[in-house]
C-alpha cells in the first residue's frame, strides 16, 4: 500500500526534538531528584542509591530521547537561577556555584547523567552518554588580583 499525504495548508515536520520545550517534551521543572544527585556529586558527597535510581527513572520517563539533553540543560539553568548564579551567554558567571562545588564540575555532572543512568541519547558529541552541550560551555575565568 502507498501512503498519500494531502497538504491542507499546515506545516508538517518530523525534526527530532522539535517538541523539546518545558511543558511539552519534558516537565517545566524537570528532574527534581536529579537536582539533588547533582548537588551531592558536585560537593563531593556520597551518592545515595535511592536518589540516583529516582533520577534515572525521571530521565527514562522523557518520551523523546532527543529531548533528554535539552531537559538537562534546562534543569542546569534553573539550578543556577535557584542558587543565585547569574548566566551570561548561557555560562555561569562565577567559578564556584556553592561552597565546594565548582561550575565546571556541576556542568559535567549534569551533562553526564545519561551515562550514569545508562540512558541512550542520540545527540552526543563524541562521548557516549554525555550531552552535546557540555562542549559549548567554558568555565568562567578567575579574576586575577592585582
UniProtKB/Swiss-Prot annotation:
A Pfam family matched in the record: Tryp_alpha_amyl
Bilayer-crossing regions: none
Glycosylation-annotated residues: 125
Modification comment: Five disulfide bonds, which are essential for the inhibitor activity, are probably present.
GO-annotated molecular function: alpha-amylase inhibitor activity; serine-type endopeptidase inhibitor activity
Tissues of expression: Endosperm.
InterPro entries linked to this entry: Allergen/amylase_inhib_rice, Allergen/soft/tryp_amyl_inhib, Allergen/tryp_amyl_inhib_CS, Bifun_inhib/LTP/seed_sf, Bifunc_inhib/LTP/seed_store
Residues annotated as signal peptide: 1-14
SMART domains documented for this protein: AAI
Subcellular location: Secreted
Entry keywords, A to Z: Allergen, Alpha-amylase inhibitor, Disulfide bond, Glycoprotein, Secreted, Signal
UniProt subunit comment: Monomer.
Function (record text): Could be involved in insect defense mechanisms. Inhibits insect-type alpha-amylase.
Annotated PANTHER family: SEED ALLERGENIC PROTEIN RAG1, TRYPSIN/FACTOR XIIA INHIBITOR-RELATED
Similarity comment: Belongs to the protease inhibitor I6 (cereal trypsin/alpha-amylase inhibitor) family.
Name of the featured protein: Alpha-amylase inhibitor BMAI-1
Organism: Hordeum vulgare
Gene: IAM1
